[in-house]
Amino acid sequence: MHHDHLISTIKKRRETLNINQEALAELANIGLRTLKQIESGRGNPTINTLQKLADVLGMELKLEVIKK
């Protein structure tokens, strides 16, 4: 599932950069609880929240809409 891959990518990048959840939440200006929910797969992040995380982690968020 794409959602699982996205969450896994964010978490792995955070860990690669040796940033703990508290620091990432603060740097991205999102709640720690929100970040924990996202990383555990229980959250439903907005595109804005994902963009904030991507910016802090030095990643690019790319949204692609395709016809099935």
Positions of the model-derived regions?
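Recognition helix of helix-turn-helix/homeodomain-like DNA-binding domains
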Residues: 29-43
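Short basic helix-loop element that most often maps to the first helix and adjoining turn
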Residues: 8-23
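Alpha-helical residues within the helix-turn-helix
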Residues: 15, 26, 55
